Curated annotation (Swiss-Prot):
Organism: Treponema pallidum (strain Nichols)
UniProt entry tagged with the keyword Plastid: no
Fibronectin type-III domain segment(s): 22-102
Keywords carried by this UniProt record: Signal
Keyword Glycosyltransferase: no
Protein name, entry field: Uncharacterized protein TP_0483
Origin superkingdom: Bacteria
UniProt signal peptide: 1-21
InterPro entries: FN3_dom (IPR003961), FN3_sf (IPR036116), Ig-like_fold (IPR013783)
């Protein structure tokens, strides 16, 4: 027995599942007064008839659909009712109840109704501000939503702005939570109190980037064992003393000025000051000789996590007045926006006065740090 039948089920009415209001009607600004209704699949149905009548009961749309949705146009704003009739292969029909349908009055926005097309991600800021022109559609009581273009037809896929207001020039100002957006394109829509979309077809292209110049201060403490090649002629009890292991506890402060930051990649230059006690003996006996290091360096960070830089240190090293430079590889893991764990590998080339000797020092280190933002 067919599921859809006028013979076995006289006056049968299909039990259409309740449609989400957001899926019910879309009013598009691209084609004025165009809307779309959709419904769930009816088992056994091969085609559907869509009837729409106005407030006076006159049929204004009588169309056949082979899919579970139907788009229509040229309807004036107002109240309507629609009915879906399902047909099986024997052309037996069963109809849904008449359902209310409202077409909202909307106004066409100007071309490029949203400016700017690229917005800035401000560190620590609460929201982005999007400016729509004066012709942008918004009426009191509506909800404003920003839809990712790849999820434009998914109910609940939108970002709800914090507020909507007008500036003194008469433009609409829409504040959007800065944590909710990712790089991509979005469509701004107004949703009426009856949950009907009044779509504003201005596309907002979002490229998240931080302020081009900003300052921060890194303060970190950690542990750094030092592996230092010595002169080949030096021996202890006839055994070559090629490596000595030193264990200073380092205090490191870093001040950096970021020249460019986009998509979490950084090119920066800064000033670094270090003070650590330098153990020279194999038995890790401190000799009380402190080394002070000051340096000016360029560095690049990729993704805010991996860093590689070449340092240009200057100052005095008390033990032998050596000159040196080194390359440092750094990986940082930020637990929060400020607290991080840093793993660092440093390769230092030391040149003694008058070039009387050259040595290479490797220093892995592990430290915790805190970043102070401006």
């Amino acid at each position: 027995m067919s599921i859809i039948s006028r013979v076995c089920i006289p006056c049968a009415v299909l039990l259409f599942a309740q449609l989400h209001a957001k899926e019910l009607v879309h009013v598009s600004q691209l084609k004025e007064q165009e809307a779309r209704i959709s419904w769930q699949e009816v088992p056994g149905a091969v085609s559907y008839r869509v009837l729409i009548r106005n407030a006076h009961g006159r049929i204004v749309t009588n169309a056949v659909a082979t899919t579970r949705s139907y788009s229509f146009s040229r309807l004036r704003p107002g109240s309507y009712q629609y009915q879906i009739i399902a047909y099986d292969v024997l052309h037996r029909a069963s109809a849904s109840a008449w359902t209310s349908l409202s077409i909202e009055k909307v106004h066409k926005p100007k071309t490029g109704g949203i400016t700017p097309s690229t917005i800035e991600h401000v560190v620590g800021g609460e929201a982005y501000t999007v400016v729509x022109d004066r012709x942008w559609t918004y009426e009191k009581g509506w909800t404003i939503a920003l839809f990712p273009d790849d999820k434009a037809d998914e109910a609940g896929a939108y970002v709800k702005p914090l507020s909507v207001s007008k500036n003194k020039e008469g433009n609409w100002m829409v504040a959007i939570p800065n944590a909710a957006l990712k790089t991509g394109s979005y469509t701004l829509r107004a949703i009426t109190p009856r949950n009907i979309y009044a779509e504003v077809r201005g596309i907002l292209h979002v490229v998240l980037w931080r302020r081009p110049i900003f300052f921060y201060y890194d303060l970190s403490v950690g542990y750094a064992p030092v592996y230092r090649p010595q002169d080949h002629a030096a021996t202890i009890n006839g055994v070559s003393d090629f490596f000595k292991i030193c264990s200073p506890i380092g205090f490191v402060g870093t001040f950096e000025m970021c020249f460019f930051k986009r998509n979490s990649s950084t090119i920066s230059a800064g000033f670094n000051a270090q003070m650590h006690s330098d153990s020279k003996q194999v038995d890790v006996k401190l000799d009380g000789n402190f080394a002070y290091l000051y340096e000016l360096y360029p560095r690049i960070e990729v993704g805010g996590m991996l860093g590689l830089g070449y340092s240009l240190p200057f100052g005095q090293r008390k033990e032998d007045d050596s000159m040196y430079s080194y390359v440092t590889g750094t990986m940082k893991y930020f637990f929060t926006n400020s607290i991080y764990l840093r793993v660092q590998q440093q390769h230092m080339l030391t040149v003694k006065p008058s070039f009387t000797g050259v040595s290479l020092q490797q220093t892995p280190s592990l430290s915790f740090g805190y970043r102070f933002h401006n």
